[in-house]
């Protein structure tokens, strides 16, 4: 019995030693940089986004469920979004034809762009993309990180990292980041965000105080790796309460991303199967 017990103890020390040798802040810094490259590379792909919103009353009972299905394309370096379904049903034939005409027009306009015009649009898209992801670059300074262990997710090893606000952080987005904590999972081999589960530890306001998020609200996301190595969103959501102006909203919303493929200039809207 002594040798097996000793082996277990030695194995435990090896695991702890392996974890302590990893700096979670460094892991996060690398992951943020990789995420920026992923987001940039996504512009050569088209994919579908389903949006499900479940609205509840003050007692938590469901009042209404709304769903949409859209396709996202990049035309001439600029994102283009058009609808496919609403509330589980294909668009009426008239609306489908209208959306196809709009897509054909946008595709034709993109094909006539000069190199300078295309480059300018790409630069504008890149500027907006950097703005959308800007907050991520402040994560290493805004939080204290704890390496909690490893997990296997989708047959790949991932670090599990606890995230807590750094008490003395007063930098950009501090008004938001100081009110969120949770757990991040990072792919070990490629330093990519695999998933996140974040909670509001305090209520906070956003958008010049025009909107606020209630304490206890939850934000989550999951990413997946495509066969060519690109990491993309799989699903993301919000659960909780918010206030917009004087209106209180209680809802769960989830976005699901699917059917990633290289964009073809002859893309046409194909009615989704009922």
Residue locations for each model-derived region?
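Structured extracytoplasmic
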Residues: 21-181, 188-195, 199-217, 223-233, ...
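Bacterial N-terminal signal peptides that target proteins for export
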Residues: 1-11
């Amino acid at each position: 019995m002594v040798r097996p017990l000793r082996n277990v103890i030695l194995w435990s020390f090896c695991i702890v030693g392996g974890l302590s040798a990893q700096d979670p802040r460094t892991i996060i810094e690398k992951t943020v940089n990789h995420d920026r490259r992923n987001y940039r590379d996504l512009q050569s792909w088209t994919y579908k986004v389903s949006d499900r919103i479940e609205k509840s009353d003050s007692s938590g009972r469901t009042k209404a469920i709304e769903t949409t299905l859209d396709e996202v394309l990049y035309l001439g370096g600029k994102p283009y979004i058009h609808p496919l379904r609403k509330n589980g049903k294909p668009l009426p034939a008239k609306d489908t034809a209208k959306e196809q005409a709009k897509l054909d027009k946008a595709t034709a306009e993109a094909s006539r762009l000069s190199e300078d015009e295309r480059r300018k649009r790409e630069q504008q898209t890149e500027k907006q993309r950097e703005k959308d992801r800007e907050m991520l670059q402040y994560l290493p300074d805004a939080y204290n990180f704890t390496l909690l262990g490893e997990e296997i997710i989708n047959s790949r090893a991932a670090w599990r990292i606890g995230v807590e606000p750094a008490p003395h952080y007063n930098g950009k987005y501090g008004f938001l980041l100081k009110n969120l904590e949770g757990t991040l999972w990072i792919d070990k081999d490629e330093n990519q965000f695999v998933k996140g589960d974040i909670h509001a530890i305090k209520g906070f306001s956003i958008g010049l105080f025009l909107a606020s998020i209630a304490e206890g609200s939850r934000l989550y996301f999951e990413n997946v790796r495509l066969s060519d190595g690109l990491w993309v969103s799989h699903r993301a959501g919000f659960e909780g309460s918010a206030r917009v102006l004087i209106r209180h909203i209680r809802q769960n919303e989830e976005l699901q991303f699917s059917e990633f493929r290289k964009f073809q200039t002859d893309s046409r809207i194909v009615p989704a199967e009922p």
